[in-house]
């Protein structure tokens, strides 16, 4: 898996709107047959997000499978300027590349991990759909279900998750602290209810369980969490903890 961070001089435009525009730009760079293929996938092999800083704007693209990386990576590296509909042409100031391999994830899983508390920062609006309805407050079950589905489909090529494992994870994890706010993500004319902020939870159980959680969350920093991660929703990062 690769992470590409495109840095621009700060763009004074809402990050959520930019994320959708950048996604449209990305699709324009790809072969139309491949774009059609992507639209048919149950879980997209990429995730994006836009992060606004004080002096710059970053467009982050995660390539989550080897096949998608082979088709997209070199195209992305050649991008020097970006045109987003009604905005002035944007010049790329720099591109940073990071990598997360399956071997690194396996190393985390096999480690003597004994971290009990984990903190997730929801950088972009994050949301779930359950039984046909939007969910604007996270539960541990929804968090783990999303991560396990993405990991299973994109890394292990397994379309279905193990419900027993999901049950066990959910039963042994408890939200201990949160600071969340309602946030809406607009896609064209649709406003999707979601949330942003920070959540801390505790995992009780064997070291193997805690290591599995750490592996899933590390993967989640690339895959995103919840729905519409290819459009810019569900961008997360882990907060480093000492306990």
From Swiss-Prot:
Claim: Flavoprotein is one of the keywords in the record: no
Annotated TM spans: none
Enzyme class: hydrolase
EC identifiers of the protein: 3.1.-.-
Gene3D superfamilies registered for this protein in UniProt: 3.30.70.1900
An example Gene Ontology molecular-function term: endonuclease activity
Pfam families reported in the protein's UniProt record: CRISPR_Cas6
InterPro entries listed in its UniProt record: CRISPR-assoc_Cas6_C, CRISPR-assoc_prot_Cas6
Family: Belongs to the CRISPR-associated endoribonuclease Cas6 family.
Additional comment: Encoded in a type III-A CRISPR locus.
NCBIfam families per the UniProt record, alphabetical: cas_cas6
Protein name: CRISPR-associated endoribonuclease Cas6
Species whose genome carries this gene: Streptococcus thermophilus
């Amino acid at each position: 898996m690769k992470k590409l961070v495109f840095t621009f001089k700060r763009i004074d435009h809402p990050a959520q709107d930019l994320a959708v525009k950048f996604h449209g730009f990305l699709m324009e760079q790809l072969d139309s047959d491949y774009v059609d293929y992507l639209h048919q996938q149950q879980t997209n092999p990429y995730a994006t997000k836009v992060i606004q800083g004080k002096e710059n704007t970053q467009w982050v693209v995660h390539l989550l499978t080897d096949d998608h990386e082979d088709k997209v990576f070199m195209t992305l590296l050649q991008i020097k300027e970006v045109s987003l509909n009604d905005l002035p042409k944007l010049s790329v100031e720099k591109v940073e590349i990071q990598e997360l391999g399956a071997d690194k994830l396996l190393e985390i899983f096999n480690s003597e991990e004994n971290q009990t508390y984990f903190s997730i920062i929801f950088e972009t609006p994050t949301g779930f759909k359950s039984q046909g309805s939007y969910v604007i407050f996270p539960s541990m079950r929804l968090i783990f279900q999303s991560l396990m589905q993405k990991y299973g489909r994109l890394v292990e090529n397994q379309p279905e998750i193990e419900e027993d494992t999901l049950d066990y994870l959910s039963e042994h994890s408890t939200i201990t602290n949160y600071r969340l706010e309602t946030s809406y993500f607009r896609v064209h004319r649709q406003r999707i209810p979601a949330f942003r902020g920070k959540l801390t939870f505790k995992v009780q159980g064997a070291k193997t369980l805690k290591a599995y959680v750490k592996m899933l969350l590390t993967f989640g920093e690339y895959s995103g969490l919840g729905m519409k991660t290819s459009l810019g929703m569900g961008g997360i990062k882990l907060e480093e903890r000492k306990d």
